Amino acid sequence: MELIIGIIVIYASVLILLFIFQRSLMYHPQENNYFGDKLEVEIEKVKIKTSDDIDLLGWFHKKDLKKFKTIVYFHGNAGNLENRTYKLNHFKDMDVNFLIIAWRGFSGNLGKPTEKGLYNDAKSAIIWLKEL
């Protein structure tokens, strides 16, 4: 019986620790796997304001908004914009526009990443594009 209680206590403790530290386990804004790739496409650094008044850093590559589709690129849960340089370079020979944004808490942006906040960031990026 003591063994079963011990296992339950350990299991509950692990669950509590996972709950407490879930944000730091899910989001890694300080991770840097940047290898020094040079950006081979011309970008404009943009600021996108969210509805909760956070400025997000973004990179916008515009060829022709009327003629070509626009890709909105959300970089994931780790690192910063520079970590995606090698991926963005694949767009250089494509007839597309693209916008990549850094989430709140990433690439020097204020705020902390949360699910609700990330949805807000994504909506703000799309609204910004529609207003061009």
List each model region and its residues.
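Membrane-embedded segments
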Residues: S51-L132
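Short, Lys/Arg-enriched, disordered terminal segments
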Residues: M1-I4, L65
